Amino acid sequence: MTIIRKKHPLIKIINHSFIDLPAPSNISSWWNFGSLLGLCLIIQILTGLFLAMHYTSDTTTAFSSVAHICRDVNYGWLIRYMHANGASMFFICLFLHVGRGVYYGSYNMIETWNMGIVLLFAVMATAFMGYVLPWGQMSFWGATVITNLLSAIPYIGTTLVEWIWGGFSVDKATLTRFFAFHFILPFIITALVLVHLLFLHETGSNNPTGLNSDADKIPFHPYYTVKDFLGVLILLMAFMILTLFFPDILGDPDNYTPANPLNTPPHIKPEWYFLFAYAILRSIPNKLGGVLALILSILILALMPLLHTSKQRALTFRPITQTMYWILVADLLILTWIGGQPVEYPFIIIGQTASIAYFAIIVIFMPIAGMIENNILDLD
């Protein structure tokens, strides 16, 4: 078996990636989220595939087909709620995975990091299009508002929006193409994940100290396969508790009302995992400025390697930057809360303050904190 594992052209790729892979001996549970994201992707593809067997991407029947899945298809309710809440679990793992990367300075592996940012955009695009498919009120109005943002692009904006819509409003053509893209994107994401792993295995994993771990490596299997399996069990337990006991807690009640272009919901808002970006978008009174801030709120992650001023890689031994980091986390939670609130006093000013703080902490305060720590430790 050892010979096959190491010699067979296909099996040896798996061997070098998941069995004989040299891994740092001290990586903590924060390194579990990569495998958990892989699990989330598999769950989403499988549940999505079974949903697609019963779903119809037509404006007249889309809402009814989702109701039919929940009422008449064997375990259709379970598949539908696993898919909807699977997206939430996916984003929880994504945010923790990115947060880990920022905390431990994993962004210094530039190719892996940039590939991760591309993956983040791809997953966000997929989730947005998936939210449109049930064709409820929030699906329709969310699609209208977000696609309309592209009209802020000078000169080509309006043409671009109508091209994406396939008409003069969000309608049948829009729903059909969103379904097509929502179906294909997860497979593209799977391919991108392999590239992400390819880049990671070029450098090897980072570790909680931020130091080079070449002198102290252990094989991935059995140590981290067992550790990942524990993470999988915990994730699945949390996931099934959410799905079976609180399936609608993260959804919007408006989406149980069929889409009606003549009736606007009082508060149009996206799913919870987009609220922080939505709050940043809304905090700028100018449409184009808002769109740029929205894109930059994610794209700023690509600047992380350039903004790294410290001589140390991780934040493990850097209390000043640690403080900045946790203020940033709190700020993101505030933005998430504000994104779900109506546009009125005092939420407008809180959102604007939190948006400025978000960019200021990343671009100004964390780099300055890094330099201060260098001086304290005399690391010139």
Curated annotation (Swiss-Prot):
Heme 1 (or BL or b562) is low-potential and absorbs at about 562 nm, and heme 2 (or BH or b566) is high-potential and absorbs at about 566 nm. It is a multi-pass membrane protein. Heme b b562 binds at H83, H182. PROSITE patterns: CYTB_CTER, CYTB_NTER. The lineage of its organism: Eukaryota, Metazoa, Chordata, Craniata, Vertebrata. Binds 2 heme b groups non-covalently. Component of the ubiquinol-cytochrome c reductase complex (complex III or cytochrome b-c1 complex) that is part of the mitochondrial respiratory chain. The b-c1 complex mediates electron transfer from ubiquinol to cytochrome c. Contributes to the generation of a proton gradient across the mitochondrial membrane that is then used for ATP synthesis. Heme b b566 binds at H97, H196. Pfam families: Cytochrom_B_C (PF00032), Cytochrome_B (PF00033). Its cofactor is heme b. The cytochrome bc1 complex contains 11 subunits: 3 respiratory subunits (MT-CYB, CYC1 and UQCRFS1), 2 core proteins (UQCRC1 and UQCRC2) and 6 low-molecular weight proteins (UQCRH/QCR6, UQCRB/QCR7, UQCRQ/QCR8, UQCR10/QCR9, UQCR11/QCR10 and a cleavage product of UQCRFS1). This cytochrome bc1 complex then forms a dimer. It is found in: Mitochondrion inner membrane. The chain crosses the membrane at residues 33-53, 77-98, 113-133, 178-198, 226-246, 288-308, 320-340, 347-367. The keyword Metal-binding applies. GO terms for biological process: mitochondrial electron transport, ubiquinol to cytochrome c. SUPFAM superfamilies: a domain/subunit of cytochrome bc1 complex (Ubiquinol-cytochrome c reductase), Transmembrane di-heme cytochromes. A ubiquinone binds at H201. The gene is MT-CYB. Keywords: Electron transport, Heme, Iron, Membrane, Metal-binding, Mitochondrion, Mitochondrion inner membrane, Respiratory chain, Transmembrane, Transmembrane helix, Transport, Ubiquinone. This is Cytochrome b. One of its GO terms (molecular function) is metal ion binding. InterPro entries: Cyt_b/b6_C (IPR005798), Cyt_b/b6_C_sf (IPR036150), Cyt_b/b6_N (IPR005797), Cytb/b6-like_sf (IPR027387), Cytochrome_b (IPR030689), Cytochrome_b_C_euk/bac (IPR048260), Cytochrome_b_N_euk/bac (IPR048259), Di-haem_cyt_TM (IPR016174). Gene3D superfamilies: Cytochrome Bc1 Complex, Chain C. Belongs to the cytochrome b family. GO terms for cellular component: mitochondrial inner membrane; respiratory chain complex III.
